[in-house]
Amino acid sequence: MSLSTEAKAKIVAEFGRDANDTGSSEVQIALLTAEINHLQGHFSEHKKDHHSRRGLLRKVSSRRNLLDYLKRKDVARYTALIERLGLRR
């Protein structure tokens, strides 16, 4: 199950430059992080759900690529974002 519309709107409002900013790297990374955290809870209960695990790994890879892009373009925004999201790095 993906995030609700309200949860997505809250993340966009928190990490976006304005209410309609859904394309910036920070917003995309924050949305992927929320979806990854949701799926991790799913796997604590459904350990053998390998089909969904593939989707999780795809989201993790996508987030990794966006983080690498942001780090290349603007290190200050990158470090601020990983601190706000609580990601290791």
Swiss-Prot record:
It comes from the Bacteria. The keyword ATP-binding does not apply. GO terms for molecular function: rRNA binding; structural constituent of ribosome. The keyword RNA-binding applies. Keywords: Ribonucleoprotein, Ribosomal protein, RNA-binding, rRNA-binding. One of its GO terms (biological process) is translation. InterPro entries: Ribosomal_uS15, Ribosomal_uS15_bac-type, uS15_NS1_RNA-bd_sf. SUPFAM superfamilies: S15/NS1 RNA-binding domain. Disulfide bonds: none annotated. One of its GO terms (cellular component) is cytosolic small ribosomal subunit. It holds the Pfam family Ribosomal_S15. Belongs to the universal ribosomal protein uS15 family. NCBIfam families: S15_bact. Part of the 30S ribosomal subunit. Forms a bridge to the 50S subunit in the 70S ribosome, contacting the 23S rRNA. One of the primary rRNA binding proteins, it binds directly to 16S rRNA where it helps nucleate assembly of the platform of the 30S subunit by binding and bridging several RNA helices of the 16S rRNA. Forms an intersubunit bridge (bridge B4) with the 23S rRNA of the 50S subunit in the ribosome. This is Small ribosomal subunit protein uS15. The gene is rpsO.
